[in-house]
């Protein structure tokens, strides 16, 4: 009976550990709440109460802190880069034997380098060096991000532009997908349905990352990362 309880306890521990947990929000992309302004006290007996009206002509597009706005993600980038490098170096240096009083200078000092290798122990010598290096690389990258994310207005700039930010976290199969975005929106770029294209964002910061088993499966091991790092001499 005790063994059965221990086994059930261990199984429950592992099942609890495998349960997906929602990660805490990133403070840099946290939603901004509007400033709470208490409505005026209602006047009992009156038909109209200030602060509770609904205007038929109000523009419901985002315009103040805390308002929500939907960003239509339409990101697509294509980049290509190539480089070729070639270096050749050829150096030669020669020294003729000096003459003294019409005859060449000779030294009778065998086994001294480089004099021992020269003919007649003279000072005449020649040095040649040659080196070559060539290298090349090509890189191409294609990215596409489509979707929608609703964020909040964090700040209204003096010129009327809106600073927006927000994030979306989706947990699927013990893995989390993060979509984070921030930027500056011109009010004139906001459509009547309160949406704006991500192509219209200034100073845009977009991130689409994930974690969990699927994310870890796409990562190289530490030994593979070493062979592809800059510390690998070959």
Curated annotation (Swiss-Prot):
Function comment: Assembles around the rod to form the L-ring and probably protects the motor/basal body from shearing forces during rotation.
Residues bearing a lipid moiety (S-diacylglycerol cysteine): 18
Cell compartment(s), UniProt: Cell outer membrane; Bacterial flagellum basal body
Lipidated positions per record (N-palmitoyl cysteine): 18
Keyword terms: Bacterial flagellum, Cell outer membrane, Lipoprotein, Membrane, Palmitate, Signal
One Pfam family linked to the record: FlgH
Biological process terms in GO annotation: bacterial-type flagellum-dependent cell motility
Subunit-structure text: The basal body constitutes a major portion of the flagellar organelle and consists of four rings (L,P,S, and M) mounted on a central rod.
Identification of the protein by name: Flagellar L-ring protein
Gene Ontology molecular functions: cytoskeletal motor activity
Native species: Nitrosococcus oceani (strain ATCC 19707 / BCRC 17464 / JCM 30415 / NCIMB 11848 / C-107)
Membrane topology of this protein: Lipid-anchor
Family: Belongs to the FlgH family.
GO CC terms: bacterial-type flagellum basal body, distal rod, L ring; cell outer membrane
Cleaved signal peptide residues: 1-17
Ranges that cross the membrane: none
InterPro entries: Flag_Lring (IPR000527)
């Amino acid at each position: 009976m005790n063994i059965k309880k221990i086994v059930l306890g261990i199984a429950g521990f592992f099942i609890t550990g495998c349960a997906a947990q929602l990660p805490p929000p990133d403070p840099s992309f946290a939603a901004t709440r509007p400033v709470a302004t208490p409505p005026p006290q209602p006047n009992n007996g009156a038909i109209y109460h200030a602060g509770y009206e609904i205007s038929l002509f109000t523009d419901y597009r985002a315009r103040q802190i805390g308002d929500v706005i939907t960003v239509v993600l339409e990101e697509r980038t294509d980049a290509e880069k190539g480089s070729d490098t070639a270096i050749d170096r050829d150096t030669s240096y020669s020294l003729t034997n000096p003459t003294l009083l019409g005859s060449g200078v000779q030294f009778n000092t065998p086994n001294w380098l480089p004099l021992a290798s020269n003919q007649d122990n003279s000072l005449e010598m020649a040095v040649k060096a040659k080196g070559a290096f060539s290298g090349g690389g090509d890189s191409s990258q294609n990215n596409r991000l489509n979707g929608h994310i609703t964020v909040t207005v964090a700040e209204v700039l003096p010129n009327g532009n809106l600073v927006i930010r927000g994030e979306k976290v989706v947990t699927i199969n013990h893995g989390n997908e993060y979509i984070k975005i921030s930027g500056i929106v011109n009010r004139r770029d906001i459509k009547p349905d309160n949406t704006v294209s991500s192509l219209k964002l200034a100073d845009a910061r977009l991130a689409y990352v994930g974690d969990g088993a699927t994310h870890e499966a796409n990562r190289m091991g530490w030994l593979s990362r070493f062979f592809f790092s800059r510390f690998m001499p070959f």
